[in-house]
């Protein structure tokens, strides 16, 4: 009798757990709205996002479109889950206006040697996180950088890979 109670309890617990799903980060988190006038699209996924020990992550994106768009940089923790910043909250939290033909830089924080058009406010340390680059235009090219925060001529600056819609180059 005790075995059937325990086994019934385990089945109930398994059913309860099966009904809850955890977000896996940039792969399945809901895409937020970053504009009242156009739909938001996931353009790129960025692994290796760091905001720690004097290193910041920046994305530099250029519009190839003939109309203005909105651009956003959404950061995720190493363990996945929902985004660490709310890009739907507007400028100052990883979202910028992207005029036609313009280039904009969004960073996890300020750095002496790199110009940022916007930084993500109130973002804590991120060690080996990830990100999504979102826009209201699909005609946007981006690159990513890891940059030393304090150097006017950064001793550390390197590009990071950015993947179009979860695919690496050559896939």
Predicted ranges, named:
Residues 19-21:
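N-terminal signal peptide c-region/cleavage motif recognized by signal peptidases
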Residues 1-10:
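Bacterial N-terminal signal peptides that target proteins for export
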